[in-house]
Amino acid sequence: MLRALLLISACLTASIAHALTSAEARGMAIGDSTSRIEALNKAATDPDEKTAAFIQALADDAVKTAGGTVFIVKDDKATDPVTGAALKLPDDAEDVTNNNLMRGELDNALASLKLFSKDPKARADAIKTLASG
């Protein structure tokens, strides 16, 4: 709950969103849960649209990695999370696995992002998600 409140506070004070970098995408997708959550919380403090889309892709289990490269896979098509460019998915690409702790943090990050939605229902749902976390 404290993390969620800190994330909300950071989002409210952020003035300019910075673009998702390859290093941030790798940090959120590769490594142990603790380091991935740290990278997620850092990226979610002032996200751009690509960062928000990448967080959603992580939550949707639509992210794979191979050789330190991160891919978003949708409809059997791989794209670069930073540029959006189409990429060839290597045969040895592995699914990014989210344990329950990571899933909870992804849900909180997505809810925090939805606090700024123009849709009142989305904002209300976000508040409920954060309050229950």
Language-model-derived ranges and their functions:
Residues 1-8:
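Sec-dependent signal peptide recognition
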Residues 14-16:
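N-terminal signal peptide c-region/cleavage motif recognized by signal peptidases
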Residues 19-133:
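Extended repeat-based scaffolds of very large eukaryotic assembly and lipid-transport proteins
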